[in-house]
Regions:
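Active-site-adjacent loop/helix segments that line or gate small-molecule/cofactor pockets in enzymes
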Residues: 1-25, 39, 63
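Short, acidic, Ser/Thr-enriched surface-loop or helix-capping motifs
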Residues: 28-29
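PLP-dependent aminotransferase-class I/II
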Residues: 133-202
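Glycine-rich loop-to-alpha-helix module at the N-terminal edge of alpha/beta enzyme cores
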Residues: 6, 33-122, 126-128, 135-136
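Electropositive phosphate-/nucleotide-binding environments in soluble metabolic enzymes
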Residues: 16-20, 47, 51, 74, ...
Length: 203
């Protein structure tokens, strides 16, 4: 009936049926409790059924359930944008909302690409990535992430990128310290940018 994510339908174990949640705990239909160690895929960072969040949602639903931000605006969206911009120390001046991380990555890929198209630098269309990175499961987000068992089958759909080793000493294939691993990645990046930028500088 339901196609659950990251599962093979013909060999997956039945999912655990959850009846309620509170704080960091999930409770199944038999009353057993489980720690939600992944925060339901990183979205319940304040715990489940937090009283302040529940009350804020109730208050908002009594006023306005939803309105698109294309030609419209509303106070909560503007207030949150203002608060977010305060913590950037003036580095940013606009907030673009997204409903999930993968879509946010897709938006930023498009923004970066469109910026250089609009400024006439149409050759600047190569994205770089670290080999062990993860940014989501949409096509663009997988393209700028590392190759894994979850996205390998979709390689033919992804756009080409330049990949560099992640400076992670715990899994460093060159057995280097953090300083040396970071320096090695920097050398790779510098070499790549020199290869890309030199022809532009000479033209």
């Amino acid at each position: 009936m339901i196609w659950y994510p990251f599962t093979l339908q013909f060999e997956s174990d039945p999912p655990l049926k959850i009846k309620r949640a509170k704080g960091e705990f999930l409770y199944d239909e038999n009353g057993n409790s489980y720690i939600d160690a992944v925060s339901s895929w990183w979205v319940s960072i304040h715990g489940h059924n937090h009283p302040k969040i529940i009350q804020a949602v109730k208050n908002q639903l009594n006023k306005l359930d939803h309105v698109l931000l294309a030609g419209f605006t509303h106070d909560p969206a503007e207030k949150l944008a203002s608060e977010l911009l305060k913590i950037t120390d003036g580095l940013f001046h606009r907030v673009l909302y997204s409903d999930n991380g993968s879509t946010a990555v897709e938006i930023m890929i498009k923004l970066a690409y469109q910026y250089f198209q609009n400024t006439g630098e149409t050759d600047r269309r190569t994205f770089i990535k670290f080999n062990a990175s993860y940014h989501g499961d949409t096509i663009g987000a997988m393209s700028v992430g590392g190759n894994s068992v979850f996205n390998r089958v979709f390689q033919g759909l992804m756009f080409p990128t330049e990949e560099f080793l992640t400076p992670n000493c715990s899994f460093c294939p060159m057995k280097k310290s953090l300083t040396l691993a970071t320096w090695n990645v920097w050398i790779q990046l510098k070499s790549f940018f020199k290869k890309i930028l030199n022809p532009l500088r000479e033209s």
